[in-house]
Amino acid sequence: MAFQSPLTFNDEQLTVAQLKSQLDLFANAQKQAFLNHHPVTDLVLSRAEYMDLLLTRLWRYYGFSEIHNISLVAVGGYGRGELHPLSDIDILVLSKHKLPGELETKLSEFITLLWDLRLEVGHAVRTVEECAAIGREDLTVATNLQEARLLCGSENTFQDLKKVVLSDSFWPSETFYRAKIQEQRERHARYHDTTYNLEPDIKSTPGGLRDIHTLSWVARRHFGATSLLEMSRYGFLTDAEYRELVECQDFLWRVRFALHIELKRYDNRLTFAHQIQVAEHLGFKGEGNRGIEMMMKEFYRTLRRVAELNKMLLKLFDQAIINGGETEPAVIINEDFQRRGRLIEARKPALFQARPETILDMFLHIANDSTIDSVSPPTLRQLRTARRRLNKFLHTIPEAREKFMELVRHPNALHRAFSLMHKLGVLAAYLPQWSQIVGQMQFDLFHVYTVDEHSVRLLNHINTFSYAKNHDKHPICCEVYPRLQKKELLLLAAIFHDIGKGRGGDHSEIGEKEAYDFCIEHGLSKPEAKLVSWLVRHHLLMSVTAQRRDIYDPEVITEFAKQVRDEERLEYLVCLTVADICATNPELWNSWKRTLLAELFYSTQRALRRGLENPVDVRERIRHNQQLASALLRKEGFTAREIEVLWQRFKADYFLRHTHKQIAWHCEHILRMDNPEQPLVLMSKKATRGGTEVFVYTKDQHALFATVVAELDRRNFNVHDAQIMSSKDGYVLDTFMVLDQHGQAIDVDNHKAVIKHLMHVLTDGRPTKVKTRRTPYKLQHFKVKTKVDFLPTKSKKRTLMELVALDTPGLLAITGATFADMGFNLHGAKITTIGERAEDLFILTSENGGRLSEEQELQLREKLIHNIAELAP
């Protein structure tokens, strides 16, 4: 990199404009070098060296070098000699005595110049005594001073500081260690104690650069080690661990450097907005989001490695150094293992290398013994070594297969063993397919965890179905799961359900074959293997049917029941489905989804018990609903004649698609209306099917659906289901199932205002404003190609249209307005939001009440794609 050394700048070059120009030249040279694959370590160190030279030249320019007993000192990361493009430049002006006023004024000019150069300078002016006093009270200051490095000025003054900082009385090694451990715990807690955050902080997230810094700070305080290499020389790290940490740090530095050259202000968050550019800078490429996903996979794997090393090394340090090697007495388990306190440890130094299947033995002991929480640090180090040296996957060892199946069948393995097996890399060492999904992310807002983390969480959620305390949250699963004859089949399906992701093609089909082969290899019968592979192949079937199909249509239930075939499969599938939803995103599971799945489960159960050759009698269901609703209405004082006159105006479909309680509620308010010319808007005070039911009864008008959903969208409410019906005399009876932004029923306190505003827009007569709010920030970084598909159906009267698009504000309203403008009738809608994607189903008829023709479908597709494009953020 060709640029002028700051030490050679003459006084005429020390203006703000000239210095800015030189800094820009240096920054551009570094950027080009990085993009040309120059080693990032050289760039990080050379930036610090450049700043050393610049600050030294300016120090001399202001005449500070002629003043005795003051020093310019680099502290913190700059003290380590590490600077990224936007890193803070932390400096300390150190003096033996308090500075006179004129010198403070001059120092102020010096600092102001640095700020004028747009350098992120953090500074302090202190005496040695002040540093000692503040450092003893403030852990951050103490840590920064520990990394102090003299730039220029008085060597003696700097050495006085070093004597204070290195003295045991400043921060005793054990006290410093305990404080740093607590600081790390608190930092990890801010990131939910997981390395898997969608927009991670490269520096502070668990497994990030701060975890490496913590290791170096602790080692520096105790040994005086000033680098990772020195830490290995003191025996704090093995050579292999040293190389691994250097490799991890190098990758994290490259990610951070790539991020900083894209930003204008200091930030270490790898946001969606910048993941694309960072991936490109690091050479990760692929179709669509493949490059981003490859980069983030490497990133998450690196965080895992750092987090594991950090935890192990700090525990080893605690055990061997802080506690002087003293340990609790060992309790012998067998010839291979013993328990020490709440930790299990191997009794032989090369046990796992000699007999790799004993790795699984260790987890069987953990599952068996509730007093064991984890693995001892020396045994963890042995496990890591054995893991790296394995020349084949564990599942190829017959004894290991037996032990794995013993674990899968163990009643305590779910909550005691599997999460730890994943965390310690044993599942990846056992199963090659699992090793491929470790760190595999999906660039979207729906999947908040990597594939491996999601799968482990799914296993943990299955375990919750064992406890009666969770019955209210998961009534069906808590009833069904305990009676499953072979729970291990469900667990194997959970392990394999997403194992095909990231390899191209349909992950369900990939997983289906691999699950079957795994089951046969592990001694399961063919029927058992077929059940597991069927669950993997169809693990999305129940969720998709419940959320994106009309489950009140007998045809839909019959088709679903045909695919499920029997109640055993249905029971396994509902447990897998619920656990899958809960493990995908903590905010996904709500009363609405619980109700949908329950209705699908029980409708299918009834169909299977009745026999698929005996479909439900629609007329009988209508009569049943009418009888029950009529009884409720008569209790309210209405006569049979009043009820009959009203119901003669309604079509049969209304009585089929509503419960008797809904019918009675609607009709009671319709019969009490003073002015039928005015709209009627009702909102259920109690949650109905897990949400708030909004019922609209009014004379039909153009784009009424669009008008209602636009108003609800304006108030940040989400429509999840709509039944669009009309009476024989031109009135609409529309029902909307609505949730708030948190997936809950709308607060009753808001009902009055919502009804008032809906009444207003329904009587206003002005054109609908389809987009009523700005596109959320996060959605602006995602692209979803708009797709309009027309689904096959046996119905000759209705068309099923599926829409996939970016879930931008106004989408539902513009879709409804398009239907109205083209003269099509909307009869129902199922609204599903999957992160940034909307996947909606609409039931349509043409203007004359029949199915849409192929030409009409083509015109509708073109019009929708055009209109939705107009909404683009």
Swiss-Prot record:
Domain note: Has four distinct domains: an N-terminal nucleotidyltransferase (NT) domain responsible for UTase activity, a central HD domain that encodes UR activity, and two C-terminal ACT domains that seem to have a role in glutamine sensing.
Which PANTHER family does the record cross-reference, listed alphabetically?
Answer: BIFUNCTIONAL URIDYLYLTRANSFERASE/URIDYLYL-REMOVING ENZYME, BIFUNCTIONAL URIDYLYLTRANSFERASE_URIDYLYL-REMOVING ENZYME
Record text on activity regulation: Uridylyltransferase (UTase) activity is inhibited by glutamine, while glutamine activates uridylyl-removing (UR) activity.
Domain (HD): residue spans on this chain? 451-573
The annotated region (Uridylyltransferase) lies at: 1-332
> Which cofactors are required for activity?
Mg(2+)
The Gene Ontology biological process terms listed for this entry are: regulation of nitrogen utilization
Q: Where is this region: Uridylyl-removing?
A: 333-692
- ACT domain location, by residue? 693-773, 800-873
Give the family from UniProt. Answer: Belongs to the GlnD family.
Keywords for the protein's UniProt record, in alphabetical order = Hydrolase, Magnesium, Multifunctional enzyme, Nucleotidyltransferase, Repeat, Transferase
Which EC number(s) are documented for this chain? 2.7.7.59, 3.1.4.-
Annotated signal sequence range: none
Q: Kindly provide the name given to this protein in its UniProt entry.
A: Bifunctional uridylyltransferase/uridylyl-removing enzyme
State the Gene3D superfamilies in the record: Beta Polymerase, domain 2, cca-adding enzyme, domain 2
Alphabetized SMART domains for the sequence? HDc (SM00471)
Against SUPFAM superfamilies, the record matches this protein to: ACT-like (SSF55021), HD-domain/PDEase-like (SSF109604), Nucleotidyltransferase (SSF81301), Nucleotidyltransferase substrate binding subunit/domain (SSF81593)
Per its database record, what is this protein's job?
Modifies, by uridylylation and deuridylylation, the PII regulatory proteins (GlnB and homologs), in response to the nitrogen status of the cell that GlnD senses through the glutamine level. Under low glutamine levels, catalyzes the conversion of the PII proteins and UTP to PII-UMP and PPi, while under higher glutamine levels, GlnD hydrolyzes PII-UMP to PII and UMP (deuridylylation). Thus, controls uridylylation state and activity of the PII proteins, and plays an important role in the regulation of nitrogen assimilation and metabolism.
Reaction(s) this enzyme catalyzes, per UniProt: [protein-PII]-L-tyrosine + UTP = [protein-PII]-uridylyl-L-tyrosine + diphosphate; [protein-PII]-uridylyl-L-tyrosine + H2O = [protein-PII]-L-tyrosine + UMP + H(+)
Give this protein's Gene Ontology molecular function annotations: [protein-PII] uridylyltransferase activity; phosphoric diester hydrolase activity
Recorded source organism is: Vibrio vulnificus (strain YJ016)
